[in-house]
Amino acid sequence: MRVLTGLQPSGDLHIGNYFGAIKQMVDAQEKSQMFMFIANYHAMTSSQDGEKLKQNSLKAAAAFLSLGIDPQKSVFWLQSDVKEVMELYWILSQFTPMGLLERAHSYKDKVAKGLSASHGLFSYPVLMAADILLFDTRIVPVGKDQIQHVEIARDIALKVNNEWGEIFTLPEAKVNEEVAVVVGTDGAKMSKSYQNTIDIFSSEKTLKKQISSIVTDSTALEDPKDHENCNIFKIAKLFLDESGQKELQIRYEKGGEGYGHFKMYLNELVNAYFKEAREKYNELLEKPSHLKEILDFGAIKARKIAQEKMQKIYEKIGL
């Protein structure tokens, strides 16, 4: 079963990225054909700073690898190294009704938050469809906010298949319901756009500051606390097994500890969990040529599949 996901190189990764998508991909490497790419074309919808995009792409590659993506088990590449995706993007555009894109929630949300209402942003779901359909993807792990984009890809695939025959595999979105939306420090969905993240590869000083900023209620230190509605607990449970969650719940219900104590505990959890990944990340960033070699290795495998797919499409469309 082929599984594909992409992540924009738009800055430092946070724990929402990890628990919402990356961990699922790492865990699935033993069972499925994993295809993972750094979505630098998609990143251009929010920034056209070339040097920044290049550096962020290398940082994203180092992050993926340090968090457990194995280039021997997964196909791992830079989106722009497989040009066929842009060809397919244009072809799929001819099968995409304007109304389908006008209903996209993500476009409206991003424009409302200040992003330029460009054609690239508007047609973002078509490029995402090209990413997915080019590789005959069966499963696309996504957060709840991206389900609609996978549905759009499926709608486009159905339209093409009705015209040309069964040329595209119909993709399905897969959402891990337990961690699909990781809360940020303010209780909203964790997102760089909201500036409420806990970054994986930040310094210990920055990490402590981010965790200290988690919004809590005003329950007194000595009183029992509501763990179910506490942002600290919601984040901490991601790092704990069932037994650990139960122990933390008991501490909340017992009282005698303030939110400052729980923030210190969360800080320890995050530092311990990502210790090895941080060390590997820093080592990889010191070897950009090695990172490029790994991405090139994946791009060769991805291009071979993409070229074979495009040849079938050329025959259908008369190119």
Residue ranges and their predicted role:
Residues 49-50, 139-143, 222:
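Short, polar/flexible loop-turn hinges at active-site or ligand-entry regions and domain interfaces
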Residues 106-160, 164, 183:
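Internal, conserved structured core segments that host functional sites
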Residues 2-130, 282:
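N-terminal Rossmann-like or analogous alpha/beta NTP/dinucleotide-binding catalytic cores
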Residues 75-78, 141, 219:
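Short catalytic-loop micro-motif centered on adjacent basic/acidic residues
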Residues 148, 154-319:
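Conserved nucleotide- and phosphate/pyrophosphate-binding catalytic cores
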Residues 98-102, 134-141, 240-248, 278:
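Short helix-capping/linker segments at secondary-structure and domain boundaries
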